[in-house]
Amino acid sequence: MFSARTAWDRTPNLLSTRLEMLVRRGTPPLDLTATSPAECGLGHDEAWLRSIVGAQPLGAYAPEPLGQVAARQALARDLLRLGAHLEPGQIALSASTSEAYGWLFTLLCDPGDSVLVPAPSYPLLPYLAELSSVELRSFPLPEDPLGALDLDVLEAVADETTRAVVLVSPANPTGWVLGEPDQARLDALCARRDWALIADEVFVEFPRRGPPARTVAARPGEALTFALQGLSKSAGLPGWKLAWTAVLGPAPERDEALARLELIADAHLSASSPAQRALPAVLTGVSEWRTRVAQRLEQNARTLTAMRPPDAAWDVMPSAGGWSAVLRLPQTTDEVAVCLARLDAGVLVQPGPLYDFPRGRWLVLSLLPPPARFAEGVGRLARTLERVLQG
């Protein structure tokens, strides 16, 4: 009765089973995986949000497939901060970047076609690809967060079914950032191979090393390119369900992509009308919130580095952006066993394979939790790592 594409293995893993048991016992661990700003004490002023929402007619509905013109005009103005000079007509609104991925897979791929994606990356991407009957092929990211892509390796992963390359910059969870030289080389490769470039930039507002924040849309090239962002990360408003895709490249391909995207979007009409009407006010009022988030990320990153013992067998990997930190363990470590031991010690982190890291040495934690909780969790983490890694 059901499609093969939805026949996912839903068996709970050891980590989720142990976590559920602890929660039932009333002893939940310190959560170092939390990525909701509001849950981490970084929410918005409710009076400000109410003033934005209260200033609009909530019952009004004027559907426009690519999004309301005023919202797209506001985005075009705001993206100037990140170096992009776009017309409002080059921007398409959706309910989320996840939805935008699905639209772009539909736009670019027939069933069975392939898309190149970075590893490590989002756990969600394989599900989105399967729902679109698209095959993902992984290429490795540099460990150096400002390091150059190996385009020979990337190209070797492709075949005649490849239609696009996905890059997340800053990458989640490693914090790798696409530099201008790499973008130019990748643009040339995509143009030569007739591939599209999909740039996921949901963390672009949060650089932590290297040059200031800049979108790939600031450097249009010869390849058809899509740059994705959304209110979930850029403004800490995941519940508002609004994201945007900037479309750039040679005019014929760009305009054809927008015309087809308009039909795809018209079939869904998913972007929230109240969120679209509120968007201009959100964009002009969110800078203080971004500053608070950036300060939290920096503070917790410093805490993590400072609390690592000098002789520890594990390392904190360098990062150039985003909300996560990655720990590298000795090569032979069973990171799932380490995560289970940490749960028993009262702290929750994520094993690397969840993000398509190679098995055996990687852990991921969020840098968003409140500083006191984060410091306590890292202290427990360091003690558990010392005990587990020393046998």
Label each PLM-derived region with a short phrase:
Residues 5-96, 103, 153, 270, ...:
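N-terminal small-domain helix-loop-helix segment of the aminotransferase-like
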Residues 85, 155, 333, 343-350, ...:
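PLP-dependent enzyme catalytic core of the Aspartate aminotransferase-like
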Residues 59-188, 204-219, 226, 374, ...:
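Conserved core of the PLP fold type I
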Residues 117, 138, 197-199, 349-351:
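Hydrophobic residues in well-ordered beta-strands that form the structural core
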Residues 132, 192-193, 345, 388:
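Helix C-cap/helix->beta junction micro-motif
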Residues 276, 280, 296-305, 315-329, ...:
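Conserved glycine-rich beta-strand-loop-beta hairpin in the small C-terminal domain of fold type I
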Residues 218-298:
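Conserved core segment of the aminotransferase class I/II
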